Each structure stands twice: as structure tokens, then as C-alpha cells.
Design a protein with these regions (language model features):
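A eukaryote-biased sequence property
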Residues: 2-21, 37-41, 55, 207-211, ...
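N-terminal uDENN/longin-like adaptor modules and analogous extended polar/low-complexity scaffolding regions
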Residues: 2-238, 397-400
Length: 405
């Protein structure tokens, strides 16, 4: 929809107070307490006149008050110009005053940061909110220009832990908006604003949509994440594919488990899992030729039981699923190491793997990580466990007896 351009008014801090920068708050976002804001940050050296004025002011204060140690004054002038937001004017002012102290730190880190802040909602109501903020340096074509500029992207949500759990999703979303920031700095209404207004729907609610679309078959995605199996989504809805990809990323164990060993050490034990095919049928997503372990089925049941409790509860269940897997994996690696010299530890490893509900996945991840097969004795223990557990799956329980020769 075409918009009428207005002359923007800038205050001394670089704040663009034109009405065109602010969108109307949607009833849904106001009800959730979720908002967004985008700023253009500018940092430039202070002029000689500004520095001289500050020096004179400081001298006057010193002559009137006792001498006290003060931090050195910054030699740069910082400002934030509002580009787009759906916050009210008072709340936006709170946010801008909060951010001006954070941007310099954000520019040193490409990741996003989450902080709590006091924000005014309505005329007199003040409460604590969480703010995700991420800065992207703006490239300048003028190499001799001394000022530094950056885009600052902010998402506001209640202080309930949502932004912390979905921080990685917000970082990826922010980076995906960078081309829109650089190409649409003037007209946000037709491009960037539409994406920003959906940030909560895109970055947070995908968990609910996946659980709703897969129902109990969400266990297949959990299994694929543990097995690191590729997932191919065939659907005419690009949002479905994006949701599945984000859910798989949320379920993977990257960054939680030990680093894998070199390719030479694990090549003999690595297996490439078969790809999972997902298609859309009758508004449901169906996984073809895919099974899930009892362990993943139990965690899928927890997700289904809590499907109406909101994205925060669902994400906590996913995080619990990952933590339990890491704990079990560490236990298996410890027992296998002890079993190299202790038959009782071998028995304990066998009993645990038999009852855990996903022994094949745990052992394969341990093999891929490399430490359990780093020695001939460790390789022998793993081979024996795999042999006995496979036999048990077919013909009932058998007690493993390690060849002591």
C-alpha cells in the first residue's frame, strides 16, 4: 500500500520521531507482549567545538564541587535513529535509552544478546521485559568517512525465558533480514515491516506448528535428529519446510556433546543414516519409511501432552530431550571405558543399553565421537555389546560374556 512520505524530525540524539517509523500495534502482539524495533546506530568523532564545550562545563562543575574521580569522557558521539517499530512512544523511548549503552558491545560480537530491562507499558505501568538485540555493521562506500554506522534489530517479549530458549532462531532470522535492511532503509512498510511483524510467528511458534502437523509422528524427527539423518521435505508450502528445518536444528546436539575425532579415527565405525522423506497429506506432514525408537516415542508423547501449553513449554521439553541424551551418552562412554578392565561394568553397560530404548543410536553416536573405539579393548567391548544387544532384540535377553583372552 503506498504511503505518504513525511519530513522526519530528528532530535539531538538522532531520534527520528516521524510517525511513519511506527506501526500500529496488532492486538495479537500486544496481547502476547511481543514487539520489535529497528534502529540505525551512528558513532562519529566529536567535533573540536563539542569537546571544548564539554571541557568548559567540566571545569565549571569542578570549581563548584569537591574534586571527585570521574571516568574519562568519550571522544565519540553516539545516536540511534528509529527506522521501524510497533512499540508505543513511551516504551520506545525506554528501549532507545537502554540500547545506546549496549550497541558498542554488540558490534564486537556477531551473535545476538538477551538482556532484561524496565519498560513502560501504557501510561503509568512499568514492568520487566526481555530484549533481544543484535547489531549489524553497515558497510560504507566512503572509505575516508570517520563515522561508523550499524543496524540494530530488537525483539521484545515477556520475562519468561522465551527469548533465551529461541535466541539462536532470532539470530538466524536477524541475519536473513540484513538484505532487506540494506535495500529498504526508506520504505519499510512494503518490505521489512511485514517480516518484522511476524517475528514471533516465524521464530517461536514453529515448534507448535510442527507438533500439531506431525502429532505422534514427531518422534520421527526426534529420531532423525539423534541419528543425524538427512530430512527431505516435499511440500507445496515453503513454511512447512522451513518449520521442519528449524525444528530439526533445535533438536540437534551440536555444541552439547564432545567434539568428534579426526576422520581417520572414526571412518571404520561411521555409518551414514538413510534420508527421511516427509510429504504433505491432508494438511498433515507424514514421514515415509521412517521409524522411531521407544526413547523418542516417549519424548514425543510428552510433546503431544503439552501441545496446548505454548512454545516455551515445548522448547523446554526439547531441551530436556537433548540433555537426557547427552547424559546417557556420557554414561555409555564411561561404562565402555570401565568395561575394558571390568566385567561388571560391561554387564552394567549391557543392562543400561538394553533398557534405554535407543541403544543403536547411543552406541553409534559414541562410535562416531571416537573415544570408545580409540583402543583395541574399547573396540572389542563395543563389538560385543552390539552383537549381544542385536541378538537380544531378536531372541530375548542374553548375558554378555567378554572373551578374556
Amino acid at each position: 500500500m503506498p504511503t505518504t512520505k513525511r519530513a522526519s524530525s530528528m532530535d539531538s540524539t538522532g531520534y527520528d520521531s516521524s510517525a511513519s517509523t511506527q506501526s500500529n500495534q496488532s492486538s495479537a502482539s500486544a496481547l502476547r507482549g511481543t514487539f520489535y524495533a529497528v534502529y540505525l546506530y551512528t558513532s562519529s568523532p566529536k567535533t573540536q567545538q563539542q569537546q571544548q564545550s564539554e571541557t568548559e562545563t567540566s571545569a565549571d562543575e569542578t570549581s563548584q564541587k569537591p574534586v571527585a574521580t570521574k571516568p574519562p569522557k568519550s571522544q565519540t558521539k553516539e545516536s540511534l535513529s528509529l527506522l521501524a517499530t510497533d512499540l508505543g512512544a513511551i516504551a520506545e523511548t525506554d528501549l532507545r535509552c537502554f540500547l545506546i549503552k549496549k550497541v558498542a558491545r554488540d558490534l564486537q560480537d556477531t551473535r545476538g544478546n538477551v538482556d532484561s530491562m524496565e519498560m513502560t507499558f501504557g501510561e503509568k505501568t512499568t514492568g520487566t521485559a526481555m530484549c533481544f538485540h543484535q547489531a549489524f555493521t553497515k558497510e560504507s562506500s566512503d572509505v575516508e568517512k570517520k563515522e561508523q554506522q550499524a543496524y540494530v534489530l530488537c525483539f521484545i517479549a515477556p520475562d519468561d525465558g522465551t527469548l533465551d530458549l529461541y535466541c539462536t532462531d532470532l539470530e538466524r532470522f536477524g541475519k536473513s533480514l540484513l538484505p532487506l535492511l540494506t535495500n529498504s532503509e526508506v520504505d519499510f512498510k512494503s518490505t521489512l515491516t511485514n517480516s518484522l511483524e511476524e517475528w514471533h510467528y516465524i521464530c517461536v511458534l514453529y515448534t507448535n506448528r510442527c507438533v500439531e502437523a506431525f502429532a505422534e509422528n514427531i518422534a520421527v524427527l526426534l529420531q532423525a535428529a539423534l541419528s543425524e539423518a538427512p530430512v527431505n521435505v516435499t511440500t507445496g508450502n515453503s513454511r512447512d519446510k522451513s518449520d521442519v528445518e528449524k525444528f530439526m536444528e533445535a533438536c540437534n546436539l551440536h555444541g552439547l556433546e564432545s567434539q568428534k575425532r579426526g576422520h581417520e579415527e572414526t571412518e571404520s565405525g561411521c555409518q551414514s543414516p538413510a534420508a527421511i522423506e516427509i510429504v504433505s497429506e491432508d494438511d498433515r506432514l507424514i514421514a515415509r519409511n521412517a521409524d522411531a525408537s521407544p526413547f523418542c516415542q516417549r519424548w514425543a508423547a510428552r510433546l503431544m501432552k503439552s501441545k496446548d501449553d505454548g512454545p516455551l513449554v515445548l522448547r523446554r521439553i526439547v531441551e530436556g530431550f537433548k540433555i537426557r541424551t547427552i547424559q546417557n551418552l556420557n554414561l555409555v562412554k564411561r561404562l565402555v571405558k570401565e568395561a575394558e578392565n571390568d566385567h561388571y561394568a560391561l554387564f552394567n553397560a549391557y543392562q543400561f543399553l538394553k533398557k534405554c530404548g535407543y541403544w543403536e543410536t547411543l552406541l553409534q553416536r559414541a562410535i562416531n565421537e571416537g573415544s570408545v573405539v580409540a583402543t583395541p579393548d574399547g573396540r572389542e567391548v563395543v563389538d560385543l555389546l552390539q552383537e549381544r544387544l542385536a541378538a537380544n532384540a531378536l531372541a530375548g535377553s542374553q548375558l554378555p560374556v567378554r572373551n578374556s583372552a
